[in-house]
C-alpha cells in the first residue's frame, strides 16, 4: 500500500504534534530576536553618518546574499573550530553550545533580521516628508519625531510585509532539522528513516505547517485591520445623498 490513512492518523500525527512546540519556539524566539536586531540595523542603514550607513548596508547585503543553510552550517559546524575546546566543555555556556537548537535560533535570527531591517528601512522612507517637517515645526526633537511620527507610521506600513516574513520564517525552521533539531520536519524525517514510509510523514508535516500558517495569518490580519481602523471612514453624507438621487428608484413616480 502506497498511502495508509490509519498509519498517518495513529502513528505519524501524534509524533508530529508533539514536535509542534519546538517549531513554535524556533519561530517565536527567532522572530522576536530578529525584530530587536532589525530595528537598529534599519536606523543605521539610513543614518547620516556615512561609515555607519555603509557598514550596515554591507552587512545587510552579506546576510541577504548568502543562503540560510550556509549560515546555519557555519555556526553549527564552524563555531567549535574557533573557540577553545576546553571553553566549550567547561564554561557555563557549554549546555547551550552543545544544543543545536540555539545554533538554529542564532542563524534564523541573524538571517531574518536582515530582511526585517530592509522592510523597516523601506517603511521609514515611505513616511511622508510633510509629516516629519510638521513635527519639527511643532518643536519636536529628532527623537520625538522618530518616536511619535516616524515609528508608528512605519510600523503600520511595514505590517503586511512583516506578516509575510513571519510566514517565511516559520517555513524556514525546517532547515533546523539538518542540524539534528527535532522539530516537525526533523520528526518527519526520523519517521521516514525508521518506517521506510515516505508519504505519510511528509503529508502529515505539510498539514501541520498549513495549519500553523493559518493560525499565524488570521491574528495578523486582525491586527492589521485594528491598526488601520482609523483609515476606514463612513462615506460623507453629501456623497450618500448624491448616490440616492442618482439611483433609478429616486426618479420613479409615486404610487
Model-flagged regions — what are they?
Residues 1-255:
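Transmembrane alpha-helices and adjacent helix-loop boundaries
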Amino acid at each position: 500500500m502506497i498511502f495508509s490513512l490509519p498509519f498517518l492518523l495513529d502513528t505519524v500525527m501524534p509524533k508530529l504534534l508533539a514536535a509542534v512546540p519546538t517549531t513554535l519556539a524556533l519561530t517565536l524566539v527567532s522572530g522576536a530576536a530578529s525584530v530587536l536586531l532589525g530595528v537598529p540595523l534599519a536606523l543605521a542603514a539610513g543614518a547620516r553618518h556615512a561609515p555607519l550607513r555603509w557598514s550596515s548596508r554591507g552587512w545587510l547585503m552579506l546576510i541577504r546574499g548568502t543562503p540560510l543553510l550556509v549560515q546555519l552550517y557555519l555556526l553549527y559546524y564552524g563555531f567549535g573550530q574557533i573557540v577553545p575546546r576546553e571553553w566549550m566543555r567547561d564554561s557555563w555556556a557549554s549546555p547551550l553550545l552543545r544544543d543545536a537548537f540555539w545554533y538554529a535560533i542564532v542563524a534564523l535570527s541573524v538571517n531574518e533580521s536582515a530582511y526585517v531591517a530592509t522592510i523597516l528601512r523601506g517603511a521609514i522612507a515611505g513616511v511622508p516628508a510633510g509629516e516629519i517637517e510638521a513635527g519639527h515645526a511643532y518643536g519636536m526633537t529628532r527623537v520625538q519625531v522618530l518616536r511619535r511620527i516616524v515609528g508608528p507610521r512605519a510600523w503600520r506600513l511595514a505590517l503586511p510585509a512583516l506578516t509575510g516574513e513571519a510566514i517565511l520564517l516559520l517555513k524556514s525552521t525546517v532547515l533546523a532539522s539538518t542540524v539534528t533539531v527535532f522539530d516537525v520536519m526533523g520528526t518527519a524525517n526520523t519517521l521516514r528513516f525508521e518506517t521506510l514510509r515516505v508519504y505519510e510523514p511528509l503529508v502529515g508535516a505539510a498539514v501541520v505547517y498549513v495549519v500553523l500558517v493559518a493560525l499565524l495569518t488570521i491574528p495578523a490580519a486582525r491586527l492589521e485591520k485594528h491598526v488601520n481602523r482609523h483609515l476606514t471612514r463612513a462615506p460623507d453624507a453629501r456623497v450618500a445623498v448624491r448616490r440616492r438621487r442618482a439611483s433609478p428608484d429616486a426618479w420613479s413616480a409615486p404610487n
